[in-house]
């Protein structure tokens, strides 16, 4: 049996009412509030059919119905239209991103705070994984005592330094020569480009200073491989205040999840690997048992080919999907624009 138009209208009304009230929904409520032009008796029969089809559930203590996971999934895929953020919300987002930013981590934290504030759920934002960071400058600075400082600047304006022991008989003029040749060869190139096409040329030209070149390349490699994901988590109290998590055991399970940064990082890394657009995971669609009873609305953000991360909103399955997906989509676009400016 398929879902006809009348059943779709009733299912949509039940999902919306349950999202708003967290109370099981009865046929009289649907008839009174949603103007479907159908009698309570007819609605009751349709609700029984929807329950038999697996789209609704009936809690033991109530005659009303609530959406099942399958019901939420059908609503998200077939019945929901993302809501455009209100003008006031757009202004809040615009104002936050116009403020002067000192670092990418500050942008990430600000985004997480915005998401949790605007959605009233928990917000997760992973730091962008740099996939094509380019080298902007290399310099060797003599320190005396047979030591030098290697300085490498990668885009966007990230400075990496390391003190090295110099080979015997190397002069300040030699250090300047190595710095000049390295800059001429690798400035503006990604680590991958340097490995594949440029490194052999550098070794041939600086054969006498191979040991120093290797020190520089070690630091460049380390700076380029610094891709450990960090996760900003905000709005924990928002989600704990939801009726679903007033149960102590459910609260403990959720807190256990939120305390595992590696797990959250893995979850967001998976979302960052998805195609562009919004991803909605509901209930047991998660691979992790700790997230049962929750939903995650996520999207990837970033500068293609350079840095990619993910942002997400975590809430109960009874999430306001239309509002959250609209906000996540809008925030993703704005965050990506900010990062594009930082990575110029």
Curated annotation (Swiss-Prot):
GO biological process entries: negative regulation of DNA-templated transcription
UniProt xrefs under NCBIfam families: hrcA
Organism: Desulforudis audaxviator (strain MP104C)
Alphabetized SUPFAM superfamilies for the sequence: GAF domain-like, Winged helix' DNA-binding domain
A Pfam family this chain is assigned to: HrcA
InterPro entries: GAF-like_dom_sf, HrcA, HrcA_C, WH-like_DNA-bd_sf, WH_DNA-bd_sf, WHTH_transcript_rep_HrcA_IDD
Protein purpose: Negative regulator of class I heat shock genes (grpE-dnaK-dnaJ and groELS operons). Prevents heat-shock induction of these operons.
Family: Belongs to the HrcA family.
UniProt keyword list: Repressor, Stress response, Transcription, Transcription regulation
The protein's name in its UniProt record: Heat-inducible transcription repressor HrcA
Top-level taxon: Bacteria
Molecular functions (GO terms): DNA binding
